[in-house]
Amino acid sequence: MENKYIKTYDNVLTKDQCNQLIQKFEISTDQQVRTEMMNHRYFTEININQHKDWEGFVLNLYDIFRPYVETYKKDCNITYNQWPEKYGFEQMRFKKYNPDGKDEFKSHVDVGDYASARRFLVFFLYLDDNEEGQTGFDEYDIKVKPEPGRLLMFPPTWTYLHTAYKPVKKPKYIIGSYLHYI
């Protein structure tokens, strides 16, 4: 099944650029935080906006994402009166899901309370290929396969329940952010 507002864009980054980001993540062990919420979400992450040594990467990624906002609007036939005149990016989180049978983010939405209600568009940038570890939208029978440089964009609201499935053979690396109302 297809959904008008779930879009992917390939080759947003090259494989080399993706590998550089993964290598930087792996050597930044002192910045990594383990997230574990019983029976719901398990992964290791870095909020890369909070670390000076990631600043160049962050600015570059924002520059890369900006044209895709316009592409997304065009591809979804979004008109000027449907889109905020001003918006900003949320801080970026770099996540690693290990193939340990545990790491996943079970079915959820990305707007669940007042604090997250500013979000209106999700960005997931996949950094490696993975036979498993898809992002699934079960209601729409859509599974997005991780590929290096693939960008997934969709609304974060209750109509877009999604799951980060467990990787099986190797880790899955993604960078995520959101567009915010300002």
What are these regions (language model features)?
Residues 1-86:
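Non-heme Fe(II)/2-oxoglutarate
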Residues 82-101:
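Acidic, glycine-rich loop-and-strand cores that form catalytic or ligand-binding grooves
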Residues 94-99, 113-131:
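Short, conserved beta-strand element in jelly-roll/cupin
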Residues 119, 130-182:
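Catalytic core of Fe(II)/2-oxoglutarate
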